[in-house]
Amino acid sequence: MAQIPARGDCSRQLTRKQAGDAWEAAARLWLESKGLRFIAANVRERGGEIDLIMRDGKTTVFVEVRYRRSGLYGGAAASVTRSKQHKLLHTARLWLARQNGSFDTVDCRFDVLAFTGNEIEWFRDAFNDHS
């Protein structure tokens, strides 16, 4: 696992993919410290990818991890656009179908874990299939 460099050094020392993987690993550890259980990472289905799938009790949690160096232009959370939400919903729908489930049969939610500079914001149930 790549180490997350000190603030501001990320883009110079790691490729975009390596930096993303490092932030996702940090997100996983942070969420596990909050009691969530890891299910899968970087789940790819036709048309999209889910960064993390976790379990919070009986709830399946689809997590989008975002990092921005600063809060300028809205910060990390603001980068999860309506279009991105639709892609995540579609990807989750396909993943659930592979698990013999659906939004109707599985208790699930969509969280965003946003790293902006040195701050972490956890947006539980940030959006849903009724948004």
From Swiss-Prot:
TM stretches of this protein: none
- Offer one Pfam family short name for this entry: UPF0102
Q: Which Gene3D superfamilies match?
A: 3.40.1350.10
Q: Which domain of life is it from?
A: Bacteria
SUPFAM superfamilies for this protein: Restriction endonuclease-like (SSF52980)
* GO terms of molecular function: nucleic acid binding
Q: Name the PANTHER family for this protein.
A: UPF0102 PROTEIN YRAN
Stated family: Belongs to the UPF0102 family.
Q: Which protein is depicted?
A: UPF0102 protein YraN
